[in-house]
Amino acid sequence: MKKIDAHAHIGVFGGWAKLSLTADELIAQMNEFDIEKTLLCSQPNELCLDAVNKYPDRILGMVYPNPYDGQKAVDMIYDYVQNKGFKGIKCNPLKQAYVADDEIMDPIMQAAEDLDIPVFMHCGHPPYSLPWSIALLAERFPKVKLTMIHMGHGHGVYIDASLKMAKRYPNLYLEMSGMPMPSKIREA
């Protein structure tokens, strides 16, 4: 059976636990658990690029733009996808303080549509990344495959909303890392 990790990070994560993970350590974990490939969503983008270049057969890069950068962010997406082989876009409204369906996302989504690549979006932190807002973005860009990362992030109301929105919009997908409710994973 093929295993693909659809959402991983490397780098220094800080916090009380002082967590960190290098590309080499990620590959060691992948080998230990027979994971064939990993979609890497890390900032800064150069860190992700270094990992992709070091392990091109194992690590697939997701470019991480800041929508507040406007055209610069769009140009970066095109560069990373067309010239560096990245496979999609990762967005985190919570980290950069914008609401998921804000018009600031339109140039990012238009680039995804033009390049025919998916967008992964962190889901489950009010007021920025609620399932309803992500669904409105999916509705506005029906040709873009949009994945709700964490499927509501462990909050029952957001998990149920993620399930309902994914059923309503055919271009909206669920990703289940950090999901503490096996019954909801089965329901998905």
Predicted regions: what they are:
Residues M1-L49:
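An N-terminally biased module of ancient metal coordination in phosphate/nucleic-acid-related enzymes
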Residues A28-F33, D50-K54, D79-N83, L136-L137, ...:
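A generic secondary-structure signal
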Residues I10, G14-W16, P65-Y68, L94-A97, ...:
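Short histidine/acidic/glycine/proline-rich micro-motifs that form metal-
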Residues E36-K37, N45-P126, R168, L172-E175:
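Active-site gating/metal-coordination segments in enzymes
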Residues T22-L26, N45-D50, K72-I77, L130-A135, ...:
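Alpha-helical scaffolding within the catalytic cores
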Residues D101-A188:
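Catalytic pocket-lining loop regions of alpha/beta-barrel enzymes
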Residues A17-L21, S42, Q71, V99, ...:
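Conserved phosphate-coordination/catalytic loops
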